[in-house]
Amino acid sequence: MIPEELTLRLSGYTKPGQELFRNVLFDQLYASIPKDPQVKVQIYNAEIAPGGHTNWHCHNGATFFLALQGIFEAEFQEGMLVRAKAGDVYSEPIAKFHRGHNPHPDVPYLCIGFCLTSPDREHVTNAVTRPW
């Protein structure tokens, strides 16, 4: 059984007689959207196994993540700059190498990623080893 605080609540917001409720998860000004007339858009879901890591990589455009389940940490050269749990929305810095980690021993980390990248760039640049 996954603890309730590690799962994003998706329903149960509307009250009797109410037909719609928008649960706003992220509403901020963001200055790093590509300025090109067109941008590449990628939307995906990802899973990091309990105790698992992503590869070392950097994002080449604006990237937003919606944590659906579990816990997430992102290790950068400066340390852990991103920490999230189910229900959080976060962005990772553009062009800063890092790797993601699921520190929970039993619960997979699940998220939805949204990427906006200039058309002449790949969404992600991967590194085989820690780049610093």
Locations of the language-model features?
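Extracellular/periplasmic catalytic domains that process cell-envelope and extracellular macromolecules
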Residues: 35-37, 58, 66, 103-108
